[in-house]
Amino acid sequence: MKKLLCTILSLTLLLTGCTIGNGNIRIGAAGIGGMYYTFANTLAGLCTKEDTGFELEVKKTAGSAANLRLLSSNYIELGIAQADLIDAAYQGTGVFTGKKCQNFKAVASLYPEACQIVVRKDSDIETIDDLQGKKVSVGEEESGSELNARQILEMSGLPEDLIKTKHLDYTDAADKLAAGKIDAFFFT
């Protein structure tokens, strides 16, 4: 399985025209504690272990939208992003209105992503409406979590200005939730 992943990555780089140059490839992940960061580090470790001839340099980013922007500006050679944000970047809609990004190729779907709202076990928050007046992390700016949080709040009819919005990465959000400094956080 490990060799298969490395082979797929190697073929991907070859077929998409990604220039390896000195053998280092920057991959945009997301915040520490999230699945993108974990996946990118695992992949980087496999590439090193399997002696692929190149090394992946994992870059901590805000997440999906940031990765697409960094990919478009050639700061990174690979990036992990949610499918809905890839479509928005390509079409120039949503957070990418007026900033169409089309100089990338989608390589693979890694896994389906569900957006979750995390609260403490002793919380009285049971519905989205219960977030009103609460301190809630919607994720880092330019993250898929932030986009999903905004979509969920809009679709539920709860204006974002009725919650006390914070922009925290997953690790900080979990720590602040455990300490009682925020009431909930969105996790995609």
What is each model feature region?
Residues 68, 76-80, 162-164, 168-188:
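Ligand-binding pocket segment of bilobal, Venus flytrap-like solute-binding proteins
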Residues 1-4, 8:
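Positively charged n-region of N-terminal signal peptides that target proteins for export
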Residues 97-110, 115:
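A structural signal for short loop-to-beta-strand junctions that line the ligand-binding cleft
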Residues 23-50, 54, 113-179:
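Bilobed "Venus flytrap"/periplasmic-binding protein-like clamshell domains
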Residues 57, 79-81, 116-118, 137-139, ...:
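Structural recognition of the beta-strand scaffold that forms the well-ordered cores
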Residues 44-45, 59-98, 173-176:
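Pocket-flanking alpha-helical
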